[in-house]
């Protein structure tokens, strides 16, 4: 504007006419104050009127600075455990119909996923038409697992046989249908390709339940494991399967396919199973599945997981742990149940971190090989993978031989039949 003004002055045009023209051209220009003479000298010396101070601005200026929030010198602001674990409530809803809800505790809050590893894994999955339980089940750990600090640290749990389940458990957000789409015949190959790209040492796979299939998808499972082992022989594979509707022959087929960890979740204590899981599932049925897997392949590590916060009692927890240990299950994990949507069963209790630590100690005392326990721990959570990976590598080093090859030969024969 100043350049234009100098140019117009050279042509003998008054600066006042320039200002009037500009005010007509730009509707957002502040009109001149009538109390100030409309002269070139006044325009040069006047300053814009200051906005009135507000009470909010005064409070903000009087409050602590940003550096005060970052400083930990003030010991008075450090919370004791009782204060830190205290749950806060909020009234939500229209006036006159407000309901009291318990706010999410701070120990259950996670960061929003945004990293190069996260984007890379997501692109690989979309390009190969693969699904993950991380997305379908709305896992709170997705930013940590997908956004690992390095390529080898990032991982995702592949969900086989599509994204639609034939069962409807009250805690799960995966889509349900009595007649889901047919299996993708390219999925075993695509899964093996994706996992080999990521260069991981340990992978976890799970699946939806497919009660619409005669074998429950067991042969699809076995084929996928064998494809992975062909592309990456040294990779360790954990399979979190369904119960195949209690068909123990299909359980044995998957157990002999070459996997390293056979996982199947009991989800909750026996007394709450009818209210939490689909009517076709059962606590004792799940125990039989894990026993059959170990019987078919004794070298396998067997694993199960339970959610806390569903209303279970301490005695029910003790009973569940005793039954799991009697079934020779090696690994157990505990995590907080978090309601995916309003259509699912509500959270009965947000269990404190020290309670999770208590059950971890008790599980290890009972003889479990490993226990991962914490509010954000999930059955396919990578917190325990490093420990299990080291155990498996140690076992592999101690007993090298044709065992793994014969396992795959048996599985291949079963697939042909």
From Swiss-Prot:
Transit peptide feature, positions: 1-26
Enzyme Commission numbers on file: 2.8.1.8
Compositional bias per record (Polar residues), positions renumbered to this chain: 44-58
UniProt catalytic activity: [[Fe-S] cluster scaffold protein carrying a second [4Fe-4S](2+) cluster] + N(6)-octanoyl-L-lysyl-[protein] + 2 oxidized [2Fe-2S]-[ferredoxin] + 2 S-adenosyl-L-methionine + 4 H(+) = [[Fe-S] cluster scaffold protein] + N(6)-[(R)-dihydrolipoyl]-L-lysyl-[protein] + 4 Fe(3+) + 2 hydrogen sulfide + 2 5'-deoxyadenosine + 2 L-methionine + 2 reduced [2Fe-2S]-[ferredoxin]
GO cellular component, one term: mitochondrion
GO molecular function annotations of the record: 4 iron, 4 sulfur cluster binding; lipoate synthase activity; metal ion binding
Amino-acid positions noted as binding [4Fe-4S] cluster 2 in the UniProt annotation, renumbered to this chain: 165, 169, 172
Known cofactor(s): [4Fe-4S] cluster
Keywords tagged on the record: 4Fe-4S, Iron, Iron-sulfur, Metal-binding, Mitochondrion, S-adenosyl-L-methionine, Transferase, Transit peptide
Binding site for [4Fe-4S] cluster 1: 134, 139, 145, 380
Compartments where located: Mitochondrion
Domain Radical SAM core: 148-369
Recorded metabolic or biological pathway in which this protein acts: Protein modification; protein lipoylation via endogenous pathway; protein N(6)-(lipoyl)lysine from octanoyl-[acyl-carrier-protein]: step 2/2
Catalytic class of the enzyme: transferase
UniProt main location, coarse: mitochondrion
Sequence segments annotated as region (Disordered): 27-61, 398-417
InterPro entries (UniProt xref): Aldolase_TIM (IPR013785), Elp3/MiaA/NifB-like_rSAM (IPR006638), LIAS_N (IPR031691), Lipoyl_synth (IPR003698), rSAM (IPR007197)
Cofactor binding, per record: Binds 2 [4Fe-4S] clusters per subunit. One cluster is coordinated with 3 cysteines and an exchangeable S-adenosyl-L-methionine.
The family this protein is said to belong to: Belongs to the radical SAM superfamily. Lipoyl synthase family.
NCBIfam families documented for this protein: lipA, PRK05481.1, PRK12928.1
Name this protein carries in UniProt: Lipoyl synthase, mitochondrial
Organism: Uncinocarpus reesii (strain UAMH 1704)
Taxonomic lineage: Eukaryota, Fungi, Dikarya, Ascomycota, Pezizomycotina
